[in-house]
Amino acid sequence: MKLLALSLASLASAATITRRADFCGQWDTATAGNFIVYNNLWGQDNADSGSQCTGVDSANGNSVSWHTTWSWSGGSSSVKSYANAAYQFTATQLSSLSSIPSTWEWQYSTTDVVANVAYDLFTSSSIGGDSEYEIMIWLAALGGAGPISSTGSSIATVTLGGVTWNLYSGPNGSMQVYSFVASSTTESFSADLMDFINYLVENQGLSNSQYLTHVQAGTEPFTGSDATLTVSSYSVSVS
């Protein structure tokens, strides 16, 4: 759906990067520290009208600050984009991972939108293979935005990283999606994302032989106007 092929051939320099011009093309990107920041308007054809631009404010190694501004109307049940910061790392088997520490500080300019703010992780049974599992961690479900779900109801409630989450499950094409949705909007977040993976391994049958292939963080808008997500600080690492 929103997964983009990420080149791991060369990691970005850890040199500090300062603010640059916004980019507005459907598939425009910017390399920023150890991230690729995507505009990623993958669902724009579902809108009657709209546009979106994304920009990098600063970056240094495993930390990045960025923003995205959008207006979308029509297609109220469809996601229009997933502007995100995608961390660049070598795909690693879950059983070999020990920690994925992350912090995220963000703010939306308005709450009069239908959108989420969410991590998006993908796993595959082989390096370079098709994604089989999608793990979303929703820090916000604004304006009634909801996750993929087979039943429309959560399958569990769990507290991880000091936040209570409702867990949903359902298919996205050939992938199985697990979505942890925060019980209340969380604009300041600090946790080890490995805790979410371990929960799924221990309680939902996710195999630890899967490879973690992508770690992304961004926003999925459905509808709204003149909305800006500002990520004042975001960091993540995989080890």
Curated annotation (Swiss-Prot):
It catalyses: xyloglucan + H2O = xyloglucan oligosaccharides. Its main location: secreted. InterPro entries: ConA-like_dom_sf, GH11/12, GH12. Belongs to the glycosyl hydrolase 12 (cellulase H) family. PANTHER family: BLR1656 PROTEIN, XYLOGLUCAN-SPECIFIC ENDO-BETA-1,4-GLUCANASE A. Glycans are attached at residue 172. The gene is xgeA. The keyword Signal applies. It comes from Emericella nidulans (strain FGSC A4 / ATCC 38163 / CBS 112.46 / NRRL 194 / M139) (Aspergillus nidulans). Optimum pH is 6.5. It is an enzyme of class 3 (hydrolase). This is Xyloglucan-specific endo-beta-1,4-glucanase A. The keyword Secreted applies. It comes from the Eukaryota.
